[in-house]
Amino acid sequence: MIKPKKSLGQNFLIDNNILNKIIKLTEIRNNNIVEIGPGKGNLTQKIIEHKPKNLILIEKDQTLVGNLKNDLKKYNNLEIFNEDILKFELEEKINKDSIVIGNLPYNISSQILVKLINFKIWLPKYKRLILMFQK
């Protein structure tokens, strides 16, 4: 069993009620989805069930990336990046039709939000942000 790493501010989203609420807020079918910090992939699985056009996962924890790659290898519309979202080159992967979803690590949630807001200022870079902030 994988336990959250406090050093990364991890808190895995496992509540089905919350997962379903996030999915209801998001038009996933045939859209480009970017998930920040997929963790163990609970939200990712729900996203996949709703048939996105493309799905990009950005996860810093190498152990979790290995598990995600193994668990999701049958999906060909999926890219997984083992990177820190604060250093990730959003411009190369996100387009104006993307929907960004994230259950943000509590220790860097403000920095991620600022990065996404600054990224949007110059041109429309994504369609919508659906973010959850942990306490």
Regions found by a protein language model. Name each.
Residues M1-K135:
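Catalytic cores of RNA-modifying enzymes
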